[in-house]
């Protein structure tokens, strides 16, 4: 069994894969203060919840955009599973060509998302990831990543809103019942949701304006689910996209 780990700024997402089948996935809060033992205990518990043990894990692949966490997490894998993880980055074959000014600056999570989208749904494809940051990456029909787009994630924007104002409360990030809000909380929810949704749709429109060939839009990320019922500009929602990409990358690097 392959264990795939996405270490993001807000969450660490762990998936267990039997071939192409995802047999379990778990999400925990990213904390730089967690020790390797704490991460190891969490991994052990997640394995047990999926009716597995450490002996069932044959290999581990990791995407990380948080270097401070990577050190202790890697140590937990070595101590509790006896495995040195494959880390998506320089020296690892991804199967994707990257035509950016500086390919090294493209996050490993974005690369895995693009690999998952291209090798699952084909190209050309615009890959949207709604996480701590919102990213769009365009992959052409040959599997080449040709552009990147980065902006604030909806939760990051929301935290700035209530964190930088004296009287606005923290609210749940969710789809409101109506844009016609009647109190402060629902007004904030409507404002955040529809402003962000409008930004998503306008961004996709601009990509379509500047790209000569038709393409599909594949969305992923923890908050993509709240937009799926309110726009027809996204073709596919795939919460497991990064796991699919990591599994593909792993397959290209093992004999």
From Swiss-Prot:
First-listed, main subcellular location of the protein, grouped into a coarse class: cytoplasm
Binding, substrate: 107-110, 184
Keyword Transferase: yes
Annotated catalytic residues: 109
Cofactor note: A monovalent cation. Ammonium or potassium.
Disulfide bonds: none
Range of residues in the leader sequence: none
Binding of K(+), residues: 129
Cofactors that this protein relies on: NH4(+); K(+)
GO BP terms: coenzyme A biosynthetic process
Entries under Gene3D superfamilies matching the protein: 3.30.420.40
Keywords per UniProt: ATP-binding, Coenzyme A biosynthesis, Cytoplasm, Kinase, Metal-binding, Nucleotide-binding, Potassium, Transferase
Pathway membership: Cofactor biosynthesis; coenzyme A biosynthesis; CoA from (R)-pantothenate: step 1/5
Its job: Catalyzes the phosphorylation of pantothenate (Pan), the first step in CoA biosynthesis.
Complex formation: Homodimer.
The family this protein is said to belong to: Belongs to the type III pantothenate kinase family.
PANTHER family named in the record: TYPE III PANTOTHENATE KINASE
Designated name of the protein: Type III pantothenate kinase
UniProt organism field: Bifidobacterium longum subsp. infantis (strain ATCC 15697 / DSM 20088 / JCM 1222 / NCTC 11817 / S12)
């Amino acid at each position: 069994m392959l264990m795939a780990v996405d270490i993001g700024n807000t969450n660490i997402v762990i998936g267990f894969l039997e071939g192409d089948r995802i047999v379990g996935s778990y999400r925990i809060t990213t904390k730089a203060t967690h020790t390797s033992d704490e991460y190891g205990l969490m991994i052990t518990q997640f394995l047990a919840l999926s009716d597995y043990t450490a002996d069932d894990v044959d290999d581990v692949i990791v995407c990380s955009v948080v270097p401070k966490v990577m050190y202790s997490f890697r140590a937990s894998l070595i101590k509790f599973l006896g495995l040195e993880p494959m880390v998506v980055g320089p020296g690892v074959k991804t199967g994707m060509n990257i035509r950016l000014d500086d390919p090294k600056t493209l996050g490993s999570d974005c690369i895995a998302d693009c690999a998952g989208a291209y090798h699952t749904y084909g190209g050309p494809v615009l890959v949207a990831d709604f996480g701590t940051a919102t990213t769009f990456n365009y992959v052409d029909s040959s599997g080449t990543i040709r552009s990147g787009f980065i902006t604030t994630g909806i939760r990051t924007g929301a935290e700035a809103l209530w964190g930088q104002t004296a009287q606005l409360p923290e609210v749940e990030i969710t789809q409101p019942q109506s844009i016609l809000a009647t109190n402060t909380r629902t007004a904030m929810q409507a404002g955040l949701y529809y402003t962000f949704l409008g930004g998503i749709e306008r961004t996709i429109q601009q990509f379509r304006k500047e790209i000569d060939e038709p393409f599909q839009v594949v969305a992923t990320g923890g908050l993509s689910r709240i937009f799926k019922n309110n726009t027809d500009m996204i073709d596919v929602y795939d919460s497991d996209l990064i796991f699919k990409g990591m599994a593909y990358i792993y397959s290209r690097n093992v004999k």
